[in-house]
Amino acid sequence: MLVETKARVGVFAIALGAYLPQFPTLVPEFEGQYAAFKKTVPDTVEVIDGGIVTTKEQSMAAGDKFRTADVDLVILQLLTYATSYNMLPAVRDLDVPIVLVNVQKKKAPDYANTDTPTWLGELYACGAVGEMVADLERAGKRHAVITGVVEGGDPGVQAEIEDWCRAAQVRRRFRDTNLAQIGRPYPGMMDLYIDETNLYNRMWLYTKQFDWEKMWAIADNVTDEEAIRAKAQDILDTFDIEGGGTIEKVWDMARYVVAFEQWVKDEKIAFVASHYDGFAKGVAGKLDSMLIPAFSMLIKQGTACAVEGDIKVSMAMSILKTIAGCGQLSEMYSIDFNEDICIIGHSGSGDADISKAKRPTMKIVPVFHGKTGGGYLTQFYPPVGDVTYLAITQDKDGHFKFVVAEGVNEPGPIFTFGDTNMRTRFSCGAREFCNRWSEAGPTHHMAAATGRHIDTILKVAKIFNVPVDIITR
């Protein structure tokens, strides 16, 4: 990615302090279990280690570390029974979910030969889970529980831990980067309009405003011909260009991409929402004609670029790019009633990482429908198979909401006029999907990613404390 971010995850373990002097063998036992547990947290995140907590004071010290680090998530290992005061001081001042990991060391007791310290050390992790959740509820904290076993390995537990860490990456990306708004939303698309201060207060995403005059001049000082040539080759490697492509043909486009990449790094931009509604002449027309593929090159590198000035869909694209590896802007295009299929897609910039069925294509059109000017269009080709859609919307009080659905992309004819589009079948049928999706009140744009990702999106939603409407899965 052009702007790298890394989630910070607070990790600690708790046990009842009264057990340790009674059964001293529990000390090395718990130390070994905690050391092994920390290794299950993927190295894609930064671990903030709160240690093994057996007293209120140790819990407060862990909480100080978590608060100072501004953790995106807390993962708590329950080693044995513990009272909730071992936990609450560590999380009291945090506004992130606490994931309680209840992993038992042994698959089953050796009933006849189990003594008290063996039971407490290897078989009693589940004893305090309900108590912890009860007090997290009373403290107004979000929470989740993962139950499993150490002996023999437990892929389900490992997958859940990794999924939570993947979701935590979204929060860190929102907090550590910026959103660039260039111009303003498409006139009259009021579902796209947004209060940027409310966005920051609720989602921790800061908006930087940029004028098109700056964008027109952004490449004026790019003179490194080696960098431009390398980027031109990157463009040719990414797209099949109608009529053939050469480095000379995409030279100006490559120069702008080099400039945009540096701008993204300098401004720490992970989201772009842009729309131009002026005269497509001169330098304005030049950039406007090549902006779609130029921004597609940014999307490929992790910066979500949305057309029509849609900030909310740029957020959805970034979420899916972060958790699923691709994020394609889409909207409801058409319904094939004969086949009970929804045609979903959009014109404009797209994500090469979703184009698994075919290499993306680029062609020149005389007019961008509904917009100023004409120029290059890019079309991407999502594969057949599972697909997830995510839209972000708001209620009348400004609270955000996720709207999600899973379906299956099927083979068959698609539109060929230059827009990305796919044929998606939903379990509820095309008519009912359109009704349910629309009734949820999303913006008319959504993001798409290959695979099924609702479970991870639910974790992201819990981290941001926003509700989710699941349309179908």
Regions found by a protein language model. Give the residues of each.
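Cap/lid and interdomain-hinge subdomains that line or gate substrate/regulatory clefts
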Residues: L2, K6-V9, K107-A232, L236-F239
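Short beta-strand elements in bilobed, periplasmic/extracellular small-molecule ligand-binding domains
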Residues: E31-T55, R142-G148, L205-D211
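Short, well-structured alpha-helical segments in soluble
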Residues: S59-V71, L88-A90, V257-D266
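Periplasmic-binding protein-like
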Residues: V71-T80, V99-V101, I269-H275
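Short, acidic/small-residue loops that bind anionic groups at enzyme active sites
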Residues: P89-D115, L120-A128, P293-E308
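Long, internal scaffold/assembly segments composed of regular secondary structure
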Residues: A232-I323
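C-terminal catalytic subdomain
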Residues: S296-T416
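Extended hydrophobic packing segments that form well-structured cores
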Residues: G370-R473
